[in-house]
Structure formats: C-alpha cells, structure tokens
Design a protein with these regions (language model features):
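Conserved ATP-binding subdomain of kinase catalytic cores across diverse folds
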Residues: 1-201, 206, 215-217
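Catalytic activation segment of kinase domains across protein kinase-like and atypical kinase folds
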Residues: 175, 200, 205-253
C-alpha cells in the first residue's frame, strides 16, 4: 500500500499538481488537501485495486483486534484490578492506543488501555505465562540480592488469561537516584545479566529494560527464552557468531 502511494505521489509531482516550495510542504499538501478530495481519492482507488484490497484487510483486522481487546478486558477486569491495580476499580475504559512494538497475527500489537482514573494498563496479544514464570524466578533471585544488601528486584505486575495478557504501565524514573541507588542498580543489573545469560535470553536492549530507581525492570520478555537458529556461513563466521551468542554479550544487556 505504501509503495502504491509513493508511485502516486511521484506521478502527481511529475504532473505538477503538488503545491509547495519544499518537500515537506508538498507532502503536507498531498495528505491534507488531495487525500481529502473525494473525487481524487476515488480515482486513486480505481487505479490501485490491490492497495484497496490491502486496506480492507488492515481495517478488518484492526476492527477485529479492537473487539478482542475490549471483550477480553471486560471479561477479566476483576482479575486485572486485583492482580495489577491493588484491587482498586479502574473505572471506564476511555481509550485504546495500538501500534507499540512489533505486530503479530494479522497486525496485532501491544496496546495501551487508558481508564478514567488516568491509570494505564498494557494489553499484550499473547499469553504471559513466561512473564509469570520469570517473576517467580526473580523472587528467588531477589532473596539473594537482598541478602547482599542490594535490595529486591522491582517486578512487573501482570495477569494472563488464554491468549491475552495485561501488565502494569511502568514509567522510567526521571529523577536521579542517590549514589547508593545508582550503585545498587548496577549491581542488580549484573545479577540480571547473569540470569538472562543462563536463560539464553536475547534482545534485552535499552528499549526493553527500564531504569526504575535502584532496579532494572524488563518490560518485554518475549525473547527471554528463545530457540537458537542455525545460520549459514563459513566455519569462521559460525564460530564468531556462536561465541557472541553464547556469551553475556548475546543478551544485548
């Protein structure tokens, strides 16, 4: 669909129909003026039937996904309030914001659910059984960390039912921590790196780990346990790749 629109933009540009002195102004004219002209849009749809077919699929999938989010959340709201919101009512659902992270299974992606008490809950279109198992492991690891004087790990509250999951929305800490908190954070990050290495986790970069005061918090555990794929190449390339993957560096922490 995007490629079709790029072709169309180039066509109307060559025809001298775009208005504006800069690329930004011409792009704005195309989106805000030309795409609001019903006759022009009808002609574009007639010229690019495959694009229209893809649009129909995307719209159908989006509507189906929104229905699933609302239905699943409504059916499990009491458990969500208990496990994530301390038993307090979340109130009415005011909005659903999608488009965060990768898409799966017909365009489904992580969504933010906005409730009337200004509380946000994260909806994920898959089971969070791994997240719950990870939390149980980290509770035990937290005992060790606490015994060393570093404090316990901050874990994400979550609930799962069937092929859906909900987690609390965690804001990263914007205030600088004390020297002790910063020291504890880095020591905990070292412990966490060890755990992730043992689990053969990967993709644990800065977008998946939030700094919350003195504790690193993983907010995306999709790759905490993952299969190792065999990639072709020379023996030297494979050896180098294996050494990286089978090391702490392979976790990307």
């Amino acid at each position: 669909a995007y490629r079709s629109l790029i072709v169309e933009v180039n066509y109307v540009k060559t025809a001298g129909r775009l208005v504006g002195d800069t690329p930004e102004e011409r792009a704005e004219y195309f989106s805000d003026t030309m795409l609001r002209d019903r006759e022009y849009v009808a002609s574009v749809m007639a010229d690019y039937p495959e694009m229209v077919r893809l649009f129909h699929i995307r719209i159908k999938n989006a509507l189906s996904y929104f229905r699933k989010i609302i239905n699943d959340t409504s059916a499990n709201i009491r458990s969500i309030e208990t496990e994530i919101n301390g038993g307090e009512k979340l109130g009415r659902l005011l909005g659903v914001v999608t488009g965060s992270g990768d898409t799966h299974n017909g365009g489904q992606s992580v969504a933010r659910l906005i409730f009337e008490n200004e509380r946000m809950i994260i909806y994920k279109p898959h089971s969070l059984a791994i997240d719950l198992a990870y939390n149980r492991v980290m509770e035990k690891v937290g005992d060790y960390s606490e015994s060393l004087g570093y404090g316990r790990f901050r874990l994400t509250k979550c609930f799962t039912a069937g092929d859906s999951g909900w987690t609390e929305f965690i804001h990263s800490s914007s205030e600088p921590g004390s020297d002790e908190e910063i020291e504890n954070y880095h020591k905990k990050l070292g412990i966490l790196s060890c755990v992730l290495y043992v689990l053969s986790a990967g993709d644990m970069h800065s977008e998946n780990i939030i700094a919350l005061k003195e504790s690193p918090v993983i907010i995306d555990l999709e790759t905490v346990i993952q299969p190792r794929t065999v990639i072709g190449g020379s023996e030297v390339e494979q050896n180098v790749r294996d050494k990286i993957i089978n090391s702490v560096k392979g976790t990307l922490v």
